[in-house]
Amino acid sequence: MKRISSFDTGLYAGRVIAFLFLCCPLRADAISPNEWRFRQTLEVGQGGLVRFSLPAETLDAARPNLEDVRVIDSAGREVPYIIDRPLPQPESAVRPKEFHAQIEGTMTRLNLVTGTKAALRAISLEAPGGGEFTKPVRVEGSQDGQSWRPLAEHEPVFRMPGGASNLRISIPDGAWAFLRLTIDDSRSAPVPFTGAELNTGALSAPTEPMAVSIKSRDENPGVTRLSLNLGAMNLTPASVHLDTPEPLFARTVTVAVPQIGEGDITEKILTSTVIYRMDVGGKTESRLDIAIDRPVEARELVLLIANGDSPPLTTTGIRAERRAVYVMFSSAQAGRYALLMGNSQCAAPNYDLSALAQDLKGAQSNAAQPAGIERNPDYKAADALATVSLTGATIDVAPWGFRKSVKMTGPGTQAVELDLDILARATHDLGDLRLVCDGRQIPFLLEKTSISRPIPMAQSVANDPKKPNISRWSLTLPKAGLPICRIVCTPGPGVFQREFHLSETVTDGVREDFPIALGTTTWRQTPHQKPRDIVLELNPGPTTDRLILETDNGDNPPIELNNFRAYYPVTRAIFRASPVSGAPTWLYYGDGDASVPRYDVSLVATELLRSERLVASTGPEEVLKATIVGDTLTGASLYLFWGVLGLVVVGLLLVVARFVPKAA
C-alpha cells in the first residue's frame, strides 16, 4: 500500500477546498432571515475551510437534527456546510481461541489464548449462578507465553446483593497473543469462571464539558430518582459522573429520558450500568462514570439509583460531558458570517456535499468561535406552541361531580401534579379530567413519572380468634380508589420467614361481599442481615379504603409490623396557559361516563415536553352535585350505612303499623 505523506495530505485537502469553491459556490438563492428566530455572528479570520464546534445554546435553539441551521455570509447569501458528529466506534466482542481455568492454592488462574491480532481493551468474564462474591484480579499479557507484562492490578470483579455486578476488567489498549488472569481467593471461596469475551478497542470521539445540575431528588422504596437539568436540548451526553463521599458501595444506575407516548409522557430507558467504590486487596477501586452516548431531545435526564436494602447513596455533585458537534464550510474570504437557527417549518438543506464529508473531516481547517446567541428582531413566523390554540371546544360541566382551581405563577407551559382528591375521584384511566377556562377546555398531556409518593396508613390488629396461627392487620387508606402501587412496613426484631397476603373486600351490585387478592410476597429476616422494610407490590390496585394483610405464623411466635405506608405514582397534567386571560382555570373530575379527551396538542407534544415548565398547584375541592351516599362509601362505612338504613326502615314500619286500624 502506498504511504501518504503529510505533503500529499495537505495537497489533497487543498484540492478538496478548491473543488468546493468550483462546484459548490456561495449560493445566491433567496433566503429570508426573518423566518429564523435566532442568529449568531461568526468572525472568520481568513479564507479557506472553517470548522467550529456548535455551543450548547445553539443546539438548544435548533431543531433536534439541525435541519434548520443555515450559514450566511455578510451579503446574506446562503453558504453550503457539513455537519460532523464524531461518535465513538462501538466495541466488538470475540471469544478467545482457548480458555483454561485452574485453582492453585489460594488463587484461581485463567489462561487465555486470544486468537486475534486486534487491539484489546477489556476482558469480560462469565460466572454462572447467582452467588455473591468480590475478587481482586491481576491481568498480564504476553506475545510468546513466556515473558509476561502486567496490564492491570487489583481490578475488582463482583456480584453483590440486589443484582449489582461487574465482571469486566479494563486493560490498556493493545494486541496480545496470551492473557493470564490471577484471581485472589484468600478471603472467600473460589468462583467457577467458565468463559470470557475479549472486547476489542473502540475509537474514541471528542467531548466537551456540559453544564448539568440536579433539579430534583425523590426517594422511592429501594430507589433514588435524580432528575438532571442538562441546561439545553438536543445534546448527546457522553457520560455522567457522580460525586459521593460514600467509602464503600455498589449501585446499579438506570438512565431514562421523558418520551411522548399515546397522548401522554412516559419515561424511556436508555441504558443501565454499575457504579462502585470498594476495597479490593487493601486498595480502593472506584468507577463513578455512567456512559450514555445517546441523543437526548429534552432538557431532562433521569437517573434511577437502585439502593436495594442499603440507605440512599449520598451525592455531593455531578459532572457531565457531551459529544461535540462541528460545522464545516468553505469561506471565500475573511469576514463576518452568521448562523441562523430556530425555524420549525423549513426543510433540511441539500447541498450535495455528502460525497466529500469524509474527506473534509480530515482536511486542515481554520478555527472559529460563534458569538453569543441573539434573538432575530425581524422574526415573524410563530412558534409551534403559539400556533396551537390555547383553548379547545366548549364544555358543559354539569355531569362532573368535582372541581379544583388551578393556581399559576405566570403564563407559559405549566405542570400541575394530581393530588389524592383527584386521583381518588377520577376514573382509573384519568379519562374524565378536564382543564377549563372561561367555559372552554384547555388541551393538556398527562406525564406519568417514575416518582412515587408515600401515604401513611392507619393500622390495627384484626386477628381472628378461630385462626390463632394467622396474624392479620387492618390497614386504612385516607380515601378509597387511590392508585396504590405498593405497601411498605417495618418489621420488628427477630428471625423469620413469612409469606404475606394482601386483600380487600368489595361489594357487588347486590351488596354481597367477596375478597380480592391484591398482592403477595415472601420475606426473610436472618441473624446476619440488617433489618429491612417489607415491600409488597400491588396488582391490581385497591378500590376500597380498607385492606387486610395476613400471614401464617405456623408454630412460630407472631411478628410485629409497624409504620405502614402506601405509595402511589406521581402523574402531572402539562398544558400551556394564556398570557392574557384573567379568567380562573379549573380542573374538573368525577364523571364516570366521560371518555378520554382528544386534543390537537398531541401535534406539538414534543414542544411541550422540551419547553421550560412552571409549577402550578390546585386549590380545595369543590363538590358540584349531590351523590348517592351509599355509592360513595366503602368497607366498614358501607356496612354501617346499610345497617343504620335498615334500622330506620324497621322503625318507620313500626310507627306506620301503630296508625293502621286494627281489624274488628
Label each residue range with its predicted role.
Residues M1-Y12:
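N-terminal secretory signal peptides that target proteins for export/translocation
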Residues S6-F7, F19, K662:
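General helical structural elements
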Residues G14-P25:
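Bacterial N-terminal signal peptides
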Residues I31-A664:
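Extended non-catalytic domains of envelope/secretory-pathway proteins
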